[in-house]
Each structure stands twice: as structure tokens, then as C-alpha cells.
Design a protein with these regions (language model features):
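Short, extreme N-terminal segment that most often corresponds to the first beta-strand
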Residues: 1-32
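Low-complexity intrinsically disordered segments
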Residues: 41-191
């Protein structure tokens, strides 16, 4: 089983986050998110947040609105569009998991599977990386939480003996832009 996690952006206290099925540990997905921040300005990250529309991962392609379908032609190009009609959004966007850079390469794709509640289940969500555009920080989360954190914005509800993931590190985006450090160096005690 892969190391599952969550990644995405937050603005105006609203998450646009998606599930990542494997390699979510800091040295993989974490470093990818860190590198994404290094290569993008705060304005570019705000633009991405603003253009992303969240969809339910179980929603069928045939159920998409015209607005949601707009720009997805590139995703159909490798397959017969008629064969994909009954596919769900999770399957269609599988190759976008954990890679915000793909939204740059495929600029017309503007949908993301909505996984905002996954971070609340730290038994299964092992790591999380959220670019918080309200505070201009990268927030790094860790799963397997056996104790609640009263200040956790995702609550204190227990699920199978586990609480929501907790923030283990906040790193200013300006510091990331102005430093040669890697995420591993910021998280030295967590590796």
C-alpha cells in the first residue's frame, strides 16, 4: 500500500486539496510541493487557486457541467472520449495526483478532485502539504495522531482512535523563495 496524503492550496479559509495515493512522505510529495513553491510566485499560486474548480471524485464524466468539461479535451486525447463517459473524476485525473505542475503544463485543465475531508482521517492520511495563501506559508501535516489538538482547524473528532492530521511545520513562502534549503532541511527531525 502506498503512503497516502493530501496536497493543495488554501485561500480565504477554504481548502482546495486533493488525495495523493502514494509517495506522500516529505522526501517525495513534500519536496515536489516545496519545489513548486520555489518556481512560482505568490501571484501565480493565487491564480491557480482561483481557477481550480473542485469536483467530487466519484462524479461521472457524463455528469459534468459544460463549465466543468471546458478545457478537458487534452485528457480525452489519449483515449476514445466515448469510452470514458462512465469513468469517474478520480480515474480521469489520476495522473494529476500530487503534481500541481501539471496544471501549468495543461493550462486548460481547471478541475481538481475535492478531498478536503481526507486530512481529518489521520489513520489513512499520513502526510499533508497545503500552500496557505492567507498566511503565505507551506503547512506540513502529519498523520497517525492519537491525541486531539484543541487548536486544529480540522477539529478534534476521533475516527477509529485517530484524530485529524496536525501541522508539524509552517514555512514562510518568502523563506522558501529566498533560501537554498530543501524541505528535508526544514524538517530535519521528521525525516
Amino acid at each position: 500500500m502506498g503512503t497516502r496524503g493530501i496536497y493543495g492550496l488554501r485561500k480565504n479559509k477554504k481548502d482546495k486539496t486533493s488525495y495523493n495515493h502514494y509517495d506522500s512522505y516529505p522526501s517525495c510529495l513534500g519536496e515536489q510541493m516545496f519545489d513548486y513553491i520555489k518556481r512560482h510566485s505568490i501571484e501565480e499560486m493565487n491564480d491557480l487557486y482561483d481557477r481550480l474548480m473542485l469536483v467530487d471524485e466519484n462524479k461521472k464524466i457524463s455528469e459534468l457541467t459544460e463549465e466543468e468539461k471546458n478545457g478537458l479535451e487534452i485528457l480525452f486525447s489519449y483515449n476514445d472520449k466515448n469510452e470514458l463517459i462512465d469513468e469517474d473524476m478520480y480515474s480521469l485525473l489520476r495522473n494529476f495526483q500530487g503534481d500541481l505542475e501539471k496544471y501549468d503544463r495543461y493550462h486548460t485543465v481547471n478541475i481538481m478532485c475535492d478531498s478536503k475531508d481526507f486530512i481529518k482521517n489521520s489513520l489513512f492520511c499520513e502526510y499533508g502539504y497545503i500552500i496557505n495563501l492567507d498566511t503565505n506559508e507551506l503547512e506540513v501535516f502529519e498523520g497517525f495522531q492519537k491525541k486531539p489538538q484543541k487548536t486544529n482547524r480540522y477539529g478534534c473528532e476521533c475516527n477509529r482512535g485517530y484524530y485529524p492530521c496536525k501541522i508539524i511545520k509552517k514555512i514562510k513562502i518568502d523563506d522558501i523563495h529566498n533560501s537554498d534549503k530543501t524541505l528535508e532541511q526544514y524538517l530535519e527531525k521528521y525525516y
